[in-house]
Amino acid sequence: MARPLKVGLDYFPLDVNIDDDVELLEAECGLEGFAILIKLWQKIYATGYFIEWNDDIELLFSRKINADKNTVNSVINACLRRNLFDNELFQKYGILTSRGIQKRYITA
């Protein structure tokens, strides 16, 4: 009998010397912004290396993590500005991902 295919990752690396863009996100959005980013990474890596993002998903995600929808939206916009997520792919396909996310997924 074939082994079932694994979807997503059980863990992802979080460097102790975090990227300056993440530090800037935390400076801009506070610890809540940092926590939202980590929760987004968890959601992404749980299923692969990107997630679709739209108003309904944002509403469900906000409810799940008990955060204000406007705060989540503000953090995502800051992540897009700071290239923590690829803005071009977000605008074109409505997905949250980045080269770094994809690289970590492939090497994990």
Question: What positions do the PLM features span?
Answer:
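Short recognition helix of helix-turn-helix/winged-helix DNA-binding domains
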Residues: 1-48
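Winged-helix/helix-turn-helix nucleic-acid-interaction surface
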Residues: 1-13, 20, 59, 63-108
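Short, low-complexity, polar/charged sequence segments that are solvent-exposed and flexible
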Residues: 30-35, 56-58, 106-107
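Short acidic, hydrophobic short linear motifs in intrinsically disordered regions
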Residues: 48-63
